[in-house]
Each structure stands twice: as structure tokens, then as C-alpha cells.
Amino acid sequence: MELRETKVAVYGKGGIGKSTTSCNTSIALARRGRRILQIGCDPKHDSTFTPTGFSIPTIIDTSQSKDYHYEDVWPEDVIHRGYGGVDCVEAGGPPAGAGCGGYVVGETVKPLKESNAFYEYDIILFDVLGDVVCGGFAAPLNYADYCIIITDNGFDALSA
């Protein structure tokens, strides 16, 4: 299977191992010569901690520092190089109870597409929180060619 310009959404409930799976998959594919962008789609913004070694600024933090003018957000402001050459972005989200984190996921793609950075990768992997009610977290499915669901045999994991 040829993986060029492929977008993959990884879903699962919190603590199930989706970020670990996403990071390991991203690094393994980067080691095989693929250009990888991993987008963390969780308000906790901890998806890309493993490849970068630190908590990277989110798209929300960066756009807030520019008075929410997305046209002033450049790829180099939000894309951070991690281990093995994996490029990483974190969507972030509003404070708890202050807005829709899922909306942020959709808005994360906008500046990346407008700057054409979205099209520079062989594989874009969305690491998405899957156990919340907010419908905005389905936004990566609008872009994804494939969806991976990380689960175990517990009822909660399957219903998330």
C-alpha cells in the first residue's frame, strides 16, 4: 500500500494508549523516510510530548498571541520538529467549561491548509480524543482517509 498524502485519524478514550500508538506509528513511519505531521487534537495538548520532549505551544495559544488573526499564524509558529523528524502540532482547546474543544480541531487545519503546509507531508496523523460528547471531535474524519480506533475489551472503551 502506497502511503502518499494519506491522512489517518486515531481515536480512543483517554488513557487507552492512542497517543502512545500515534507517536510510535509516526516515528516508525518517519524512520522509513516518510514526511510525517502528527496533530494532537486534545484540549490537554499532550499528544506530541513523546516525540518533542516538551509541551509545545498550541494553535490556540499562538493565535491568541496574535489577537486571533489566523492569517498571521505561520507554519513555523506552530509546527515543531520532534524525534525522528516527526513534525508536531497541538490544537489545544479552551479552558474547561469555556467553549467547544472540537471546534478548535477544525480550526487547526485552516491555517495549515491556507499556508499549504498541510500538503507537504506524506502522512498526517490526527490523535483525537474519543470519549467526549462534543461533535467537533469528528472534524478529523472530514480529512481522514483511514480511521484507527484504539480500544480494549472493556465496555467503556467500546462505547467511547
UniProtKB/Swiss-Prot annotation:
Binds 1 [4Fe-4S] cluster per dimer. The keyword Transmembrane does not apply. [4Fe-4S] cluster binds at residues 100, 134. Mg(2+) binds at residue 19. It comes from Polystichum acrostichoides. It is found in: Plastid, Chloroplast. This is Light-independent protochlorophyllide reductase iron-sulfur ATP-binding protein. ATP binds at residues 15-20, 44. GO terms for molecular function: 4 iron, 4 sulfur cluster binding; ATP binding; metal ion binding; oxidoreductase activity. GO terms for biological process: light-independent chlorophyll biosynthetic process; photosynthesis. Its cofactor is [4Fe-4S] cluster. GO terms for cellular component: chloroplast. Keywords: 4Fe-4S, ATP-binding, Chlorophyll biosynthesis, Chloroplast, Iron, Iron-sulfur, Magnesium, Metal-binding, Nucleotide-binding, Oxidoreductase, Photosynthesis, Plastid. Belongs to the NifH/BchL/ChlL family. PANTHER family: LIGHT-INDEPENDENT PROTOCHLOROPHYLLIDE REDUCTASE IRON-SULFUR ATP-BINDING PROTEIN. SUPFAM superfamilies: P-loop containing nucleoside triphosphate hydrolases. It catalyses: chlorophyllide a + oxidized 2[4Fe-4S]-[ferredoxin] + 2 ADP + 2 phosphate = protochlorophyllide a + reduced 2[4Fe-4S]-[ferredoxin] + 2 ATP + 2 H2O. The keyword 4Fe-4S applies. It holds the Pfam family Fer4_NifH. InterPro entries: NifH/chlL_CS (IPR030655), NifH/frxC (IPR000392), P-loop_NTPase (IPR027417). Pathway: Porphyrin-containing compound metabolism; chlorophyll biosynthesis (light-independent). Homodimer. Protochlorophyllide reductase is composed of three subunits; ChlL, ChlN and ChlB. Component of the dark-operative protochlorophyllide reductase (DPOR) that uses Mg-ATP and reduced ferredoxin to reduce ring D of protochlorophyllide (Pchlide) to form chlorophyllide a (Chlide). This reaction is light-independent. The L component serves as a unique electron donor to the NB-component of the complex, and binds Mg-ATP. Its EC number is 1.3.7.7.
